Amino acid sequence: MSKKILFLIKVIVFIFTTFSLPLYAEKIRDLTSIQGIRDNPLIGYGLIVGLDGTGDQSTQAPFTNQSLKNMLSQLGVSIPSNTNMNTKNVAAVIVTANLPPFSHAGEKIDVVVSSMGNARSLKGGTLLMTPLKGANNQIYAIAQGNILVSEKNNKKSKIHNFYSNQVNSGKIHHGATIEREIDNNFGKQKTINLQLNQENFSTAQRISDMINTKYPDTATPINSKTVQLNTSANNDVQVHMLSNIQDIDISLPSQEAKVVVNSRTGSIVINQSVRLGSCVVSNGNMSIIVHQIKNKKRDLYFLKSFNKNIKKDQSIEDMADKNYMNDIATNKENLHNIVRALNKLGTKPDELMSILQLMKSAGCLNAKLEIV
């Protein structure tokens, strides 16, 4: 059995754990949003013309021909019903956009255009006048313009089954003109609700306390997600108050410990709050021992008793002098060291996910494990 296999069987990872959570400051503007002040999604159906033979095939996308006939009819062009319009330079698309809060008629917004037929490319196409509607089926903007398609590195990945850039979708910068404004109740009510981006009772209470320090008896934490502000129904007063409140610094403990794993690629993201407890987790032919380092020399004896790669005649002093522990063990308190050690051993992504799940189940991984 090779040294690598022996090393895989017993991976000894020492973790020096610490439980002090550093505080850091965030502004209220970065932690909350104002209820009712948000973007509104818009959607529309339109046609792109001017394609270089890369549009929809009429036999497989009949709705494109039907839409083209309807458009020409509205422009006064009569097309016989039995005419087969086999055009290859037209494509049916879905147009989407976001209408920002407090937008006014006449402003421009960006739009995203996506093919809904079998067009091979939208490069060089022009979007014809397309009404964009909201959830209430009212028209809020009109889109039209030349579409910009990114073809940079447009090759299929050999490792993962996806394209780095798609040519059947694109953007139109300032491609839509706002025609209708959305009403909002800002400045018309005596209360304003701040919505926390991440629900947390402690954060809600701290935000309320800091606001009341500057504006006494103004803020009330309703729940872990909402802090209510009591004010007067006046635009000037609310704008002035919010501008000051949003700049208040809030001292918060470290963020929620979380480990996010991409099941397809094996990518792992670990935030700085992840801490490990002492335990032993086994998966297949691998065993991971997570242990607190208290005495380096004593723990080297412990390491030597478990790891078959260490020569029997190798002295503890020699191991310490050669900094042996830095090669196969760590004394950090985060999960990054375990993942790095396993990656060096050639652990596959599915094996790594199994190990993390076992560590979570055993209570060794004190963090939220999210697999996407």
From Swiss-Prot:
Subcellular location per the Swiss-Prot or TrEMBL entry: Bacterial flagellum basal body
Top-level taxon of origin: Bacteria
GO biological process terms held by the UniProt record: bacterial-type flagellum-dependent cell motility
Keywords for the protein's UniProt record, in alphabetical order: Bacterial flagellum, Signal
MF (Gene Ontology): structural molecule activity
Pfam families xref list: FlgI
Signal peptide, first to last residue: 1-25
GO CC annotation: bacterial-type flagellum basal body, distal rod, P ring; outer membrane-bounded periplasmic space
HAMAP family: FlgI (MF_00416)
Function: Assembles around the rod to form the L-ring and probably protects the motor/basal body from shearing forces during rotation.
Family, similarity comment: Belongs to the FlgI family.
Assembly information from the UniProt record: The basal body constitutes a major portion of the flagellar organelle and consists of four rings (L,P,S, and M) mounted on a central rod.
Name of the protein in question: Flagellar P-ring protein
